[in-house]
Amino acid sequence: MSEAELEQTPSAGHVQEQPIEEEHEPEQEPTDAYTIGGPPRTPVEDAAAELSASLDVSGSDQSAEQSLDLSGVQAEAAAESEPPAKRQHRDISPISEDSTPASSTSTSSTRSSSSSRYDDVSEAEEAPPEPEPEQPQQQQQEEKKEDGQDQVKSPGPVELEAQEPAQPQKQKEVVDQEIETEDEPSSDTVICVADINPYGSGSNIDDFVMDPDAPPNAIITEVVTIPAPLHLKGTQQLGLPLAAPPPPPPPPAAEQVPETPASPTDDGEEPPAVYLSPYIRSRYMQESTPGLPTRLAPRDPRQRNMPPPAVVLPIQTVLSANVEAISDDSSETSSSDDDEEEEEDEDDALTMEHDNTSRETVITTGDPLMQKIDISENPDKIYFIRREDGTVHRGQVLQSRTTENAAAPDEYYVHYVGLNRRLDGWVGRHRISDNADDLGGITVLPAPPLAPDQPSTSREMLAQQAAAAAAASSERQKRAANKDYYLSYCENSRYDYSDRKMTRYQKRRYDEINHVQKSHAELTATQAALEKEHESITKIKYIDKLQFGNYEIDTWYFSPFPEEYGKARTLYVCEYCLKYMRFRSSYAYHLHECDRRRPPGREIYRKGNISIYEVNGKEESLYCQLLCLMAKLFLDHKVLYFDMDPFLFYILCETDKEGSHIVGYFSKEKKSLENYNVACILVLPPHQRKGFGKLLIAFSYELSRKEGVIGSPEKPLSDLGRLSYRSYWAYTLLELMKTRCAPEQITIKELSEMSGITHDDIIYTLQSMKMIKYWKGQNVICVTSKTIQDHLQLPQFKQPKLTIDTDYLVWSPQTAAAVVRAPGNSG
């Protein structure tokens, strides 16, 4: 069946129309219908008629009106020849026609539907349009476009349609009488448009350019090709056979076929289909690269097809400034050339540096202050160093290392003079200078050295006291019997005994209480060698941060992790099993695989979310070793033993629905000859100043009371440990003396038995509060009720935030037989 016969076949959504021209003018040629009700024929129209006649002679199955309508050049010329008429409405419906068999590459059903949907083009020129409102028709067309939006391939060619003059009213009435149903498009109707002439002229979209002087009745419509299954119900109901689709065009030669990538994983462009037309082929190649999305809605004829704007990104400079793009015709360009050249001369060596320690971006220049420091030239040289808080301190450069930052490849390990070693760390070169004014911070000078009359070591103090006693022996007057002699509050002159020499016990207590660092001269040869080795090993810490649970903690001291782990900048430690890793990916994988959610051992205390676990070092040796390695990052003078058998570990945890999170711990020997109840105690920095330290101290003394011994922590204590213990001791003693301020006197022995604190610790604490005096060769406590109340009001002696409730403690002291296993027993 030819396409001319299909035009008379009703399709889905259309009603078969009767040839109206035959009823009114049966003898008139089809080409004359184009001029009904219109102006006289022009030479262009005569040429169109001749062209249609030639098409009919050549065997074309299309009418002259259709061929004329599909000629873009002739339609444009006809529109120019006609006088501009008043535009009543704009028809934006997509109209197209299958003109050549070579362009039909779809199935038979697709061709039939496209022909039946738009075969009314020629009939619309012959018959007047139906009196149907414009707005509903546009809404129906928009609904069809939305239904077929998911099946859009690419935009089709642009066609021109010239609106014809209105037909006589009589002919319009005849059409209304014959058509019983509205010509509404069916929901199954799909638009199918191919190229006008794929292999000839007009195949390029640039050939169809809208003349800006064209009358407004010329509409540019963009049509899309929608591949979808069609249902030609009207044709099937009539029983009309469908024509077989024409054979596809022959494939091009082998040399025209693009080469296939050698590898299926090749990232090269995919070759286009060989049966596509040149225009579709070019569009296919353009769409294979990222571009703008395909426009589905028809464009306005007055809209220009502009290329996408060029993406102009701001230029990121070393000063983090956004430089805007300026046009070539700007007058400011020539005036600022000289200024830019001067700035380039000044900033020749301007680079960016990202400080890994302070997480700040700084600008470095080529001045001498940014040059590399040679530590070997002057190891004891003192520099000015800016800390992270902005203060400038005097310090010493101890070590250097190379970083991944190309702009500032060197970092330096510095020690601040007069500050604790836990504040040492790695800093960038821009934070070190010979002049404090170059760093731009508040300069903090170290504490002044001790006065000549104040000893720096116990040996010097003993020498000064001996000289003072010899000089004042002849001038000393007899003291009154009732005069009270309080110990001095100053730690360096605590013992006010001008007529006595300091004993070895007093010297040891003085060094322990004040954490006096012994000089190498006071140590034996073996001890001095070990101390020097310890300082050389622990002087430099390479692990800057510790990722532990939800916290990233800055480390304080050196810890002897293995070589590859000890030099890592960030160490990742699982908070449940204490396994350490170097890489974040390994840490994330381990957290997913680790099934432990609490420390090993048994839980001996639980109140609220506070839990304490007792872990035997002999049973869980690996876990205890890992715990000690991690604790060494925050403890200076801590001795690590690979033999964990003699120790018990008490781990304090906060428990929630995810598990038990380690807060701190303390360890103790199973059997101590000196009755030490704490060998090592630590609260992690994120949990400090929350009362957990005093809670662990109180728990250790509670265990000592249950064992029936009076315990004390191992000495020396760190600076933070000494403050915590002194605060706990002071509050405990004040609470005991608060109810005993009667005429009878309380003794140090009674306080020791009630509190579990040793005599030496009680004397040290009362001396710091000026509540003890030395009278007739013994220490006597002399306090009043007002003195106790005044001390309890001080912030350092306030009540602890957390206390131990013995009702929740499930623990009994272990006997010697349980601690030390009898020989010969296995297991």
Curated annotation (Swiss-Prot):
Consequence when changing residue 5 to V: In strain: Congo 159, Congo 194 and Congo 216
PTM summary: Autoacetylation at Lys-638 is required for binding histone H4 with high affinity and for proper function. Ubiquitinated by msl-2.
Biased composition (Low complexity): 103-116
Sequence position, cross-link Glycyl lysine isopeptide (Lys-Gly) (interchain with G-Cter in ubiquitin): 372, 483, 532, 539, 715, 749, 776, 798, 801
Residues annotated as binding acetyl-CoA: 681, 689-691, 693-694, 718, 727, 774, 798
Impact reported for residue 426 to G: Abolished association with roX1 and roX2 non-coding RNAs and recruitment to the male X chromosome. Knockin flies show male lethality
Bias (Polar residues): 55-69
A Pfam family annotated for this UniProt entry: MOZ_SAS
SUPFAM superfamilies referenced in this protein's UniProt entry, alphabetically: Acyl-CoA N-acyltransferases (Nat), Chromo domain-like
Active site per the UniProt annotation: 714 (proton donor/acceptor)
First and last residues of each zinc finger (C2HC MYST-type): 571-596
Entry keyword annotation includes ATP-binding: no
Tudor-knot domain sequence ranges: 382-433
Keywords for the protein's UniProt record, in alphabetical order: Acetylation, Acyltransferase, Chromatin regulator, Chromosome, Isopeptide bond, Metal-binding, Nucleus, Transferase, Ubl conjugation, Zinc, Zinc-finger
UniProt subcellular location: Nucleus; Chromosome
Composition bias type Acidic residues, residue spans: 19-30, 121-133, 176-186, 326-350
Catalytic activity: L-lysyl-[histone] + acetyl-CoA = N(6)-acetyl-L-lysyl-[histone] + CoA + H(+)
GO function terms (MF aspect): chromatin binding; histone acetyltransferase activity; histone H4K16 acetyltransferase activity; lncRNA binding; zinc ion binding
Keyword Cell division: no
Functional note: Histone acetyltransferase that catalyzes the formation of the majority of histone H4 acetylation at 'Lys-16' (H4K16ac), an epigenetic mark that prevents chromatin compaction and constitutes the only acetylation mark intergenerationally transmitted. Catalytic component of the male-specific lethal (MSL) complex, a multiprotein complex essential for elevating transcription of the single X chromosome in the male (X chromosome dosage compensation).
PANTHER family recorded: HISTONE ACETYLTRANSFERASE, HISTONE ACETYLTRANSFERASE KAT8
Subunit-structure text: Component of the male-specific lethal (MSL) histone acetyltransferase complex, composed of mof, mle, msl-1, msl-2 and msl-3 proteins, as well as roX1 and roX2 non-coding RNAs. Component of a maternal MSL subcomplex composed of mof, msl-1 and msl-3. Component of the non-specific lethal (NLS) histone acetyltransferase complex at least composed of mof, nls1, dgt1/NSL2, Rcd1/NSL3, Rcd5/MCRS2, MBD-R2 and wds. In males, interacts with nucleoporin Mgtor.
Domain notes: The tudor-knot domain (also named chromobarrel domain) mediates association with roX1 and roX2 non-coding RNAs, promoting recruitment to the male X chromosome. It also potentiates the histone acetyltransferase activity after chromatin binding.
Protein's UniProt name: Histone acetyltransferase MOF
Organism: Drosophila melanogaster (Fruit fly)
